[in-house]
Amino acid sequence: MLYFLTGITASGKSDLAHKSAIENNMSILSVDSMAVYKGLDVLTAKPSDVMQAQVKYYGLDIADCDQNFSIIDYLNYLIDQDIPEKSFKEDILAVGGSGLYVKAMIDKYEFKPTDPTIRSELEQLNFDQLLKFHELNEIPIPDMELNKIDYISSSFERP
């Protein structure tokens, strides 16, 4: 079965998940969009080598820091690791704060690949230009994402 433990940054999710996984003989699936990157151990509060020896972890260190790793790549990783199938045979605790990763798993999102031409054009725009473009095209931006230029840029690439 697949269980979820989500919450805000620095709320103790990782420690609670690790303790729960040991007590309940579970594996852990990281749903942290930064933990996928190698070398960001301190920034993302990745489990230590000792912790990883105690519990099977998925979703850690699967991309280089200079690699563009998208939600599509993450979902493909889940399929490559047989996570959907494994969740029928074993208990897996998905833990992290990346809401899009969690929603994509629960709601079975399907994403279209990004268009590199559009992305290149959008990267030339500044923050105010992107906001104006959103307004003109009536593309909503959640209030909590208004300060994230990457979110605003990538929203033009989504269907």
PLM ranges: what are they?
Residues 1-159:
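Phosphate/pyrophosphate-binding catalytic cores of soluble transferases and nucleic-acid-acting enzymes
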